[in-house]
Amino acid sequence: MALRTRLGEILRPLNAEYGKVAPGWGTTPIMGVVMLAFLVFLLIILQIYNSSLIIENVDVDWSNGIV
């Protein structure tokens, strides 16, 4: 027998739709756009780190770290 707790009773409605899938594509296009934006963000960070992308007044000298 499962233990019934107050927290479990509060969270039960969130699990009521478990296993049900909305028809069609749903939010898949939104997820794709967000993933693409995150990829662009990571590429920009990588280019800044690799000094491939030069930004004025931004020093990327990693030799003398903050002590």
Curated annotation (Swiss-Prot):
Organism listed in the record: Trieres chinensis (Marine centric diatom)
**Predominant place of localization:** plastid
- Its gene is psbH
From the Swiss-Prot or TrEMBL record, what is one GO molecular function term?
phosphate ion binding
Quote the protein name from its UniProt record. Photosystem II reaction center protein H
Instruction: Report the InterPro entries cross-referenced here.
Output: PSII_PsbH (IPR001056), PSII_PsbH_sf (IPR036863)
Q: How does it sit in the membrane?
A: Single-pass membrane protein
Give the superkingdom in one word: Eukaryota
What this protein is reported to do is described as: One of the components of the core complex of photosystem II (PSII), required for its stability and/or assembly. PSII is a light-driven water:plastoquinone oxidoreductase that uses light energy to abstract electrons from H(2)O, generating O(2) and a proton gradient subsequently used for ATP formation. It consists of a core antenna complex that captures photons, and an electron transfer chain that converts photonic excitation into a charge separation.
Q: Tell me the keywords, alphabetical order.
A: Chloroplast, Membrane, Photosynthesis, Photosystem II, Plastid, Thylakoid, Transmembrane, Transmembrane helix
